[in-house]
Structures are given as structure tokens and as C-alpha cells.
Amino acid sequence: MSEHRVNHEPVFLLASSPWRESSLRVEAFSRRYGRVALLARSARKRQSELRGVLVPFVLVSASWYGSQELKTLHRAEWIGGWPQPQGRALFSGLYVNELMLKLTVREDPLPELYDALAEVMEAVCCKAAYIDDLRRFEWRLLNLLGVAPDLNRDGDGGTIAAGGTYLVRPETAVFPVGKGFAVPPHAAGVVAPGQSLIDLREGSFRTAESLQQALKITRLFIRHLLPEGLKSRQVLEQIRQFDRKETARETVPTSDGTASNAV
């Protein structure tokens, strides 16, 4: 079997883990080759040219060779384009990478998904408010994976109406329901206004309600695909709980009975 070589391919690094004594095993996503597994030999050595280059969230130019599933990375250069995310944005970047790692298969080219990944990474790294971008990315990912329902027409063949109410469930079409309809306990589903579905389809969230409904819907499908959950989301939730406890501890009553921050 001939040895396949790829040179100077822009990639996003999704994850890396130690390999033997001094190497790294890297999962990367490229526009032309999809997700690829790369072995970066001696990358953990202090004198390695790869040290400090193999970082997530920004573009890296990678060159590799090999005919097996695990390729050998022989060159990498930092392309950059934006700074590394900080604070909560860091967890959002990790969340996006974890979705890509768990929901894509190796060597399945998805150019549109690569473009969506580039857009959301730039937003997370550069914008103060990027929640809209996360919801757009999640929905594009679900669409490109073929698991998102059609939001142009409902299961009865009718056009999604802005004033209607619809039941959204995994693995089935969207169906119209009455405004008082409630999802049965322990059943997976979201009841959403038609306008929210239109906004999600178009990627333009006109109201806070539409953005909240988008979160419920994308989370519904992601939980269906990944029932074991996401580590990045669990860690962020733990931080949020810690922050809430700290806020409650630092807030003490004043002499007039109102609350005041003690710090």
C-alpha cells in the first residue's frame, strides 16, 4: 500500500494525549480530510519544534504521512488568527471540541462543518457575547450529521407557522400541537413556538425566548446522541455551582435587613 502524504493542511486540534514516553497522540479536524488521528513523535520533549505549536482553538498548518488510521505528523506551524480563549470562553471552546470529537467519525470530509468550526472558534475567542454563535454551530452540526429535523415543514406537510406551537423530538418530524400541550414525564421532547423554530432554522435569534428555545432543542438532540454527557459541560456546571455558593457566602444581611456583598 502506498504511503499517503498531506502537506500544509490547515487543521483545528480537538484533543491530545500522551503517547509513550515523549510523544503525543493528536485528534485534528481538517477541511479536506475530516477528523484525523496524528502521532506527534517526541512532541513533549523540551527541544521539540512541535512543543508549543500543537494548541487547540486556533488554526495550525499540519503535514503528515501514513496509510494506517494513525498517521505520523512530521511538521506543524502555528497559523493563528486570533488569541486563545480566556475564562468561561475557554470552557466553551472545550465544549465545541468535545462535540466534534464525540460526534464525528474519522476521515469523513465535511467541508461545511470545518467552516462552521472555524466560525464558532473565532467567535468564542474574539467576541464578548458569543452564545448565538454556539447555538448556530450546534444546529449546523446536527444538520450536517443528518439528525436534525426539517424546520421548513412539519410532519403533516404544513409549513412551520410563526404563530403555531410544535413538539420537537429526536428521530421524528416536528408536529403541531395545542398551546397547552405538555411533554409527558420522562419523555424526551420540547414544545416550542413556531417563531423560535424559524429563528433556529435561520440562525437569527430575535428574542431571548428564541435563544432559550434553541438551547433546549440543541441540548435535547445532543443528550439523545450522547447520553453519557459531556465532561466540559459537567466541569462548567461545577464551577457555576461553586460561584453560586461563594456569592451566597459573601452576601450578608445589613442592619436594615437588606443584603450586601461582604467583599
Curated annotation (Swiss-Prot):
Any one cellular-component term (Gene Ontology): bacterial nucleoid
Signal peptide region: none
Gene Ontology biological process terms from the UniProt entry: DNA recombination; double-strand break repair
Keywords from the UniProt entry: DNA damage, DNA recombination, DNA repair
Polar residues: compositionally biased ranges: 252-263
InterPro entries: ARFGAP/RecO (IPR037278), DNA_rep/recomb_RecO_N (IPR022572), NA-bd_OB-fold (IPR012340), RecO (IPR003717), RecO_C (IPR042242)
Region called Disordered, residue ranges: 243-263
HAMAP family: RecO (MF_00201)
Role of this protein: Involved in DNA repair and RecF pathway recombination. Involved in pilin antigenic variation.
Record's protein name: DNA repair protein RecO
Organism the protein comes from: Neisseria meningitidis serogroup A / serotype 4A (strain DSM 15465 / Z2491)
